[in-house]
Regions:
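Flavin-dependent oxidoreductase catalytic cores
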Residues: 1-342
Length: 342
């Protein structure tokens, strides 16, 4: 079984280790010095793959917008890491009033609009590749647009995009297929998915396995396993009382059903937990979010066996609270977060 610091080769992309910096919304923006230094610090700290936080897909329809991210991309690459960006499509969570079905203030998206969204993601993937990214991650988790299509709790359509799981996953399948055609091979496509909703009548692991298999057929490279339906959900954002390696068992069930690499996430702080997940074959990659906010050098401190020097996240959730309030995040354990220096 792989070790935490073993290289992972995915097609033409080599990841120097199995550590992923998960996409964490900062409210810093992206095209500025603050974000460049923030992400470069996590790359310098030893993460193998850096995923920039969730960003509206529409921004990446403009090649000039992507080109202005070149300094950030180069800063991460100079530290030896690979870089991707998480793309998402808006819904009522960010004030855009469309959804799979009529709900609250939202109108049901039409078939024509669905195809427009698919084309947007395909174009964005191409522009990201041309702009220097190693890959993109599609945000299909945590109650956002694609998650709403997949979940029976929010998809009440009675056409080819709603009903049984094959229909509810159709949009995701079409989207990944179009992105692969447009971006070509050798460019990483990741999909972040909530494997269970955690509510009666919601998404099941068996359905998530069907999705992972279908996306693999369409050319997906990495399946990123999370859970839950929202920002205030302890499944989506595990708490201090949550199990270490919160979603590892979910990831393991999906990994057993596919051939592509799988990411496990959720309260991984100790080397022993990360090693166990990998050695038990539950995942190929380990994603950390808040722990790498508290200590971006977590990977580098583990490599020489200096785990006692790691600054641990306390899961006080101040960072998430600030994010939800629309303010720049900060960390009670790391006063330098957002104030990184060259």
């Amino acid at each position: 079984m792989p070790g935490l610091f073993d290289i992972l080769k995915i097609k033409d992309v080599d990841l120097r280790n199995r550590i992923v910096f998960a996409p964490v919304v900062t409210n810093f923006g992206l095209r500025n010095e603050q974000s460049l230094l923030y992400y470069a610090e996590r790359a310098k700290g030893g993460a193998g793959l850096i995923i920039l936080h969730a960003t509206p897909v529409d921004l990446f329809l403009k090649p000039e917008w992507v080109r202005r991210l070149k300094p950030l991309i180069e800063a991460v690459r100079e530290q030896g890491a690979r870089i991707a960006v998480q793309l998402w499509h808006g819904n009522e969570l960010n004030g855009e009033r469309v959804a799979p079905s009529v709900q609250g203030p939202c109108l049901a998206i039409t078939r024509e609009e669905i195809q427009m969204v698919v084309r947007k993601f395909a174009t964005a993937a191409l522009h990201c590749r041309q702009g220097g990214f190693d890959g993109v991650e599609i945000h299909g988790a945590h109650g956002y647009f694609l998650n709403q299509f997949f979940s029976p709790l929010t998809n009440q359509r009675n056409d080819e995009y709603g009903g049984g799981v094959e229909k509810r996953m159709r949009m995701a399948v079409e989207l990944v297929s179009a992105m692969r055609r447009e971006a070509g091979e050798g460019f990483l496509l990741l999909y972040r998915h909530s494997a269970v909703d955690g509510e009666p009548g919601g998404t099941t692991v068996a359905e998530s396995i069907q999705l992972a298999r279908a996306l693999e057929v369409q050319g997906l490279d990495i399946f990123d396993v999370s859970a839950g339906r929202g920002q205030k959900d302890s499944l989506s954002i595990p708490e201090s009382s949550s199990l270490e390696g919160t979603h590892a068992d979910l990831a393991g069930r999906i990994k057993a059903a596919v051939s592509i690499p799988v990411i496990a996430v959720g309260r991984v702080q100790r080397r022993a937990v990360a090693d166990r997940i990998l050695q038990e074959g539950k995942a190929d990659l380990i994603a950390l979010g808040r722990q790498l906010l508290a200590d971006p050098f977590w990977p580098e401190k583990l490599r020489p066996d200096k785990e006692e020097d790691v600054v641990l996240c306390t899961y006080c959730d101040v960072c998430s609270r600030e994010m939800r309030a629309g303010r720049p995040i900060f960390c009670t354990q790391n006063p330098n977060l957002g104030r990184e220096k060259r």
